């Protein structure tokens, strides 16, 4: 059986140069895993439209507050959402429009 021909050395070095290192690969995997939960996706979608508090998100998404709070905590831990406090109410928003762009890229890819 013949061995498959490997890339030429120049191409191999080029590919290796542009590949993310193991640490970056892990960070990317963790980042994209945040989009692998339907509740988090819906939270991101809602926050791309308007800044909202937990109660409003729970109402709009027809999900209990505990679930929403848990998902927001994960999104906060990874820096996808930020918050401001107004009295006793905490309002959440996307940290950057790029978060919504990532999701919209997925929507576009799927042809919706």
What are these regions (language model features)?
Residues 23-66, 90-97:
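N-terminal helix-turn-helix DNA-binding core of bacterial DNA-binding proteins
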Residues 71:
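Residues within the DNA-recognition helix of helix-turn-helix
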Residues 16, 27, 93-112:
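Conserved segment of winged-helix/HTH DNA-binding domains
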Residues 21, 80, 112:
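Hydrophobic patch in the ABC ATPase nucleotide-binding domain
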Residues 51-52, 76, 107-110:
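Residue-level detector of secondary-structure transition/capping positions
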Residues 76-86, 93:
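Beta-hairpin "wing" of winged helix-turn-helix
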Residues 1-35:
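N-terminal leader segment of winged-helix/HTH proteins
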């Amino acid at each position: 059986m013949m061995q498959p021909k490997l890339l030429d050395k120049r191409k191999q070095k080029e590919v290796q140069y542009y590949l993310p290192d193991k640490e970056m690969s892990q960070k990317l995997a963790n980042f994209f895993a945040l989009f692998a939960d339907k509740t988090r996706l819906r939270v991101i979608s809602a926050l791309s439209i308007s800044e909202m508090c937990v109660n409003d998100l729970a109402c709009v998404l027809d999900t209990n507050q505990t679930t929403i709070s848990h998902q927001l905590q994960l999104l906060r831990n990874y820096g996808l959402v930020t918050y401001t406090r107004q009295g006793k109410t905490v309002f959440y928003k996307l940290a950057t429009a790029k978060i919504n762009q990532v999701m919209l890229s997925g929507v576009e890819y799927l042809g919706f």
